[in-house]
Amino acid sequence: MVAQLYHHLTILIASIYIIFFVNAAPTLYEDDEEDFNSTEYDVFLDSDSFQFPRRNSSCNCTREEATRTLLEALKRALQIIAGYINETDTEELPTYPPTMTTPLETTPLDTSPPVLPSAIP
């Protein structure tokens, strides 16, 4: 269940990244003579709008529309995640081996002072 939650959070973060950074980025062409002061780049830099939902589309949406779309996507993602959290697990908890009831047999520690080899007759 936790793995599913992390999976959905990862998808959510990746989606947000794609929506706001990949789709809003200016289209870079392989032509070295491309003018980076084009209107597409200016639209990206404009604080009131950015390209949404496709990079090459000519329609732009305002920040309010983008925020509304993002909030709807977040709401839907949170509903999906909440559905997983609220599910009751019918699985039983795993059983572990019982604790040892009898101590292991051990030899008592020898606490007598050491006998020096010169003291042995």
Curated annotation (Swiss-Prot):
Principal location: host cell
Location of this chain's protein in the cell: Host membrane
Low complexity: compositionally biased ranges: 98-113
Segments crossing the lipid bilayer: 9-29
Gene Ontology cellular-component terms listed: host cell membrane; membrane
Topology of this chain in the membrane: Single-pass membrane protein
Region (Disordered): 91-121
Keyword Transmembrane helix: yes
Keywords: Host membrane, Membrane, Transmembrane, Transmembrane helix
Protein's recorded name: Uncharacterized gene A4 protein
